[in-house]
């Protein structure tokens, strides 16, 4: 599901809300999640899951085009861990 599809789905389930308001809310939610992670904070949505940052050590990579070794620096990457309720609902599929 893309962001546009999410907005359309939410708008169709809430016909009293203008689609522009739904779009604004979705964009604000994503912006808030991003800003919180940028500050290094963890986000927990009970029953759904948690977002956090994981540290990746510097490592030696390889340029696939030339085969040349390249040093990749350390970095933080976003990580999502599904909550118990989400895992149980998805497991029913």
Swiss-Prot record:
GO cellular component term of the entry, any: chromosome
Pfam families per record: Bac_DNA_binding
Alphabetized InterPro entries for the sequence: Hist_DNA-bd, Histone-like_DNA-bd_CS, IHF-like_DNA-bd_dom_sf, IHF_beta
Keywords: DNA recombination, DNA-binding, Transcription, Transcription regulation, Translation regulation
Superkingdom of origin: Bacteria
PROSITE patterns from the UniProt entry: HISTONE_LIKE
One GO-annotated biological process of the protein: DNA recombination
CDD domains in the record: IHF_B
Molecular functions (GO terms): DNA binding; structural constituent of chromatin
Function text: This protein is one of the two subunits of integration host factor, a specific DNA-binding protein that functions in genetic recombination as well as in transcriptional and translational control.
PANTHER family on file: DNA-BINDING PROTEIN HU, INTEGRATION HOST FACTOR SUBUNIT BETA
SUBUNIT field: Heterodimer of an alpha and a beta chain.
HAMAP family: IHF_beta
Family named by the database record: Belongs to the bacterial histone-like protein family.
The protein's name: Integration host factor subunit beta
